[in-house]
Amino acid sequence: MDTKLLDILACPICKGPLKLSADKTELISKGAGLAYPVRDGIPVMLESEARTLTTDERLDK
């Protein structure tokens, strides 16, 4: 995924910043507590497609 795109994307729920996961398969929103999938390099920014972060993931910096 293009890092320039990541700079302009925001979480559609909380409008906060997103962070690309270490394995580059998800965009993480700590504010909303959600992880949006990245499929074939394209972020799927739908709440219905996102998974809820675990407590450990929410606390991890």
From Swiss-Prot:
Pfam families: Trm112p. SUPFAM superfamilies: Trm112p-like. GO terms for cellular component: cytosol. Gene3D superfamilies: 2.20.25.10. PANTHER family: PROTEIN PREY, MITOCHONDRIAL, ZGC:162634. Belongs to the UPF0434 family. This is UPF0434 protein PSPTO_3844. The lineage of its organism: Bacteria, Pseudomonadati, Pseudomonadota, Gammaproteobacteria, Pseudomonadales.
